C-alpha cells in the first residue's frame, strides 16, 4: 500500500475516533498532528524533542487533549483514555494507541515498524 493511501485511511479513522468520543460526550481538542521534517528532521533524524522515527513526520499520528464533563484529563490511566484507545485499535490492523507505551493521547498507524 502506498503511503498516501495509508494516510487517507488514517484520516478517515481519526474522523471515526472523533465521532466515537463525541458519542460518549468526551471532548477532544487538537494536540500534535503533522511534524514538519524541516523543523523536526526527516524520518530517522532527530532534530528536536520528537522521536527520530515519529510517524507524526509522515502524517500517520495525531495527539489529542481529552475533556470529560468539561475537565481536562491529563492522567493517561483515566478510563476514558482506555475506552478511546481500545476503540481506536479496533478500527484498523495498523492502528496503535499510545496508552500501550505511556503516551495515552497518541493515536497512530504503524508504518515501517514505527508507531
PLM region spans:
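Soluble non-cytosolic domains of exported or imported proteins
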Residues: 4-12, 75-82
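Catalytic cores and adjacent binding grooves of peptidoglycan-active enzymes
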Residues: 50-115
Amino acid at each position: 500500500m502506498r503511503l498516501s493511501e495509508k494516510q487517507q485511511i488514517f484520516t478517515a479513522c481519526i474522523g471515526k475516533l472523533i465521532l466515537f468520543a463525541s458519542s460518549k460526550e468526551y471532548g477532544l481538542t487538537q494536540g500534535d498532528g503533522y511534524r514538519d521534517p524541516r523543523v523536526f528532521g526527516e524520518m530517522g533524524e532527530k532534530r528536536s524533542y520528537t522521536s527520530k522515527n515519529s510517524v507524526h513526520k509522515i502524517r500517520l499520528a495525531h495527539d489529542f487533549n481529552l475533556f470529560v464533563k468539561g475537565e481536562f484529563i491529563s492522567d493517561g490511566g483515566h478510563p476514558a483514555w482506555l475506552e478511546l484507545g481500545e476503540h481506536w485499535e479496533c478500527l484498523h490492523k495498523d492502528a496503535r494507541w499510545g496508552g500501550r507505551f505511556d503516551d495515552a493521547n497518541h493515536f497512530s498507524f504503524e508504518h515501517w515498524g514505527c508507531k
